[in-house]
């Protein structure tokens, strides 16, 4: 059934829809299956994503038609399809009237992903009008809160050197806490790896007191504050809350130094919102394990990593992993810096839409996946700043001297970039950074050919 007369209006102007402030706009790359016209398929897609079904139904009235989603732009050659969704379509909380990401996802990327006439459809950007921005929670904490704890300026406080406890699984409580202590002697921030929680060989009620003790010892020894991101992800919201409450009790007066890590993709949006609302005084660390199933460029359905990051800010994530922008082991390109810019700035023009955030707190880009001191200067140069959290697991624990030396080398890499120094020359005066060359010789050979001869007299 051709529904283009009802669910498409190509005379609509995007600038008018934005100025009106009554629609959420979504940009897709969509391809129909063979034998289906582009506009016909696009209109069917909009119908399935809003008020329509596969036949005309007698219960439809004029009000219903007033909240139809409308295709307003198509370009078959580039697979471009843009749809305007009336704000009234989206579900609201009965408790406080606020919007929810689950409703957004249900409509814009729900049943339409299994339609028989669609080869593929993937969201690459969306626009939220001012009223929608007001109706999402947004972050309660941001990187400025971390800088404040670390004793830094709350504006441009700079790089937070972090790690992930490695190996990701298999450490019992005492070795786990010792690994944390060793890194904290040189670094700022430690996070649980996403599978770490309450394994039988490392129960949380034994691990967390030891980690707090390690934190206190490291703070006493270095005179610096330390930060820990504890994984509270669970299937059950009550279990997640119980974990969070236990951790806060355990850390006691140092609870402000604890972030809560939630695996937001596998756990779902409800886990992020529950953590945001139950623990507004904690930094909310959004881990995105599994996201590549839909965000990878090789995946033709779902949504891009840019879209995931943008949604995370609406939900209230204080920080989210954004990959390594082609500088680490994770899939990505240098242009992925746009993922960082959309969540950290108050205004940004993305691949399809300009988005204003109207003062919503920023979400911190968290950099992780194959990064070490040698890769960081180029990363910072591409991003244009160092106001990020970086969690380097192998980059710290793989340092030839010690995890503390690995942490120090990460800090020195940031200082090298800030000073606009040549990394080889910088290494001659910074021993931990210099030893990173020997620790990661494959990277050193790739990034700094001839480094062995240049550093030979400074070993």
Swiss-Prot record:
The cofactor required is: Mg(2+)
Catalysed reaction(s) here are: 2 (2R)-3-phosphoglycerate + 2 H(+) = D-ribulose 1,5-bisphosphate + CO2 + H2O; D-ribulose 1,5-bisphosphate + O2 = 2-phosphoglycolate + (2R)-3-phosphoglycerate + 2 H(+)
Task: Please give the organism.
Answer: Polaromonas naphthalenivorans (strain CJ2)
Classification lineage: Bacteria, Pseudomonadati, Pseudomonadota, Betaproteobacteria, Burkholderiales
Q: Which EC numbers characterise this protein's activity in its record?
A: 4.1.1.39
Annotated cofactor note: Binds 1 Mg(2+) ion per subunit.
Q: What do we know about how this protein assembles, alone or with others?
A: Homodimer.
In this chain's numbering, which residues are marked as the site (Transition state stabilizer)? 329
Q: Where does substrate bind?
A: 111, 168, 288, 321, 368
UniProtKB keywords: Calvin cycle, Carbon dioxide fixation, Lyase, Magnesium, Metal-binding, Monooxygenase, Oxidoreductase
Please tell me where Mg(2+) binds in this chain. Answer: 191, 193-194
Repeat found in the keyword field? no
Under which name does UniProt file this protein?
A: Ribulose bisphosphate carboxylase
Q: One Pfam family name from the record?
A: RuBisCO_large
Q: Which GO terms describe its biological process?
A: reductive pentose-phosphate cycle
Q: Which residues participate directly in catalysis?
A: 166 (proton acceptor), 287 (proton acceptor)
Q: What class of enzyme is it?
A: lyase
Q: Which family does it belong to?
A: Belongs to the RuBisCO large chain family. Type II subfamily.
- Annotated function: RuBisCO catalyzes two reactions: the carboxylation of D-ribulose 1,5-bisphosphate, the primary event in carbon dioxide fixation, as well as the oxidative fragmentation of the pentose substrate. Both reactions occur simultaneously and in competition at the same active site.
One MF term in GO for this entry? Answer: magnesium ion binding
């Amino acid at each position: 059934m051709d529904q283009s007369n009802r669910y498409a209006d190509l005379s609509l102007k995007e600038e008018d829809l934005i100025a009106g402030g009554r629609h959420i706009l979504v940009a897709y790359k969509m391809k129909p299956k063979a034998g289906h016209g582009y506009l016909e398929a696009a209109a069917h897609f909009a119908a399935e994503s809003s008020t329509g079904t596969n036949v005309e139904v007698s219960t439809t009235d004029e009000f219903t038609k007033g909240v139809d989603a409308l295709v307003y732009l198509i370009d078959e050659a580039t697979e471009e399809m843009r749809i305007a969704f009336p704000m009234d379509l989206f579900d609201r909380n009965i408790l406080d009237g606020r919007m929810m990401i689950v409703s957004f996802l249900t409509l814009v990327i729900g049943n339409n992903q299994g339609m028989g006439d669609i080869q593929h459809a993937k969201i690459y950007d969306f626009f939220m009008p001012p009223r929608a921005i007001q109706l999402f929670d947004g972050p309660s904490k941001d990187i400025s809160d971390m800088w404040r704890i670390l004793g830094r300026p709350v504006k441009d406080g700079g790089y937070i050197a972090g790690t992930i406890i490695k190996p990701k699984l298999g450490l019992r409580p005492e070795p786990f806490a010792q690994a944390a202590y060793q890194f904290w002697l040189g670094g700022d921030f430690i996070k649980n790896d996403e599978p770490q929680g309450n394994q039988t060989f490392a129960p949380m009620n034994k691990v967390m007191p030891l980690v707090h003790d390690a934190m206190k010892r490291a703070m006493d020894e270095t005179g610096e504050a330390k930060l820990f991101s504890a994984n509270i992800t669970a299937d059950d919201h009550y279990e997640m809350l119980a974990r969070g409450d236990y951790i806060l009790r355990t850390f006691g007066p140092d609870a402000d130094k604890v972030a809560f890590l939630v695996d937001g993709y596998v756990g779902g949006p409800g886990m992020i919102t529950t953590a945001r609302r139950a623990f507004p005084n904690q930094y909310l660390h959004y881990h995105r394990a599994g996201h590549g199933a839909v965000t990878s460029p090789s995946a033709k359905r779902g949504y891009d990593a840019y879209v995931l990051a943008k949604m995370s800010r609406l939900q209230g994530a204080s920080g989210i992993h954004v990959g390594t922008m082609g500088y680490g082991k994770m899939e990505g390109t240098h242009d992925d810096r746009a993922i960082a810019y959309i969540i950290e700035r108050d205004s940004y023009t993305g691949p399809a839409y300009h988005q204003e955030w109207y003062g919503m707190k920023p979400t911190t880009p968290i950099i992780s996946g194959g990064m070490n001191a040698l890769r960081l200067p180029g990363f910072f140069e591409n991003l244009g700043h160092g106001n990020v959290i970086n969690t380097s697991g192998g980059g710290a624990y793989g340092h030839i001297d010690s995890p503390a030396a690995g942490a120090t080398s990460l800090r020195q890499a940031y200082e090298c970039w800030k000073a606009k120094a040549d990394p080889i020359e910088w290494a001659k005066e910074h021993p931990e950074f210099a030893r990173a060359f020997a620790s990661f010789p494959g990277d050193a050979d790739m990034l700094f050919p001839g480094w062995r001869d240049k550093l030979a007299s400074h070993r």
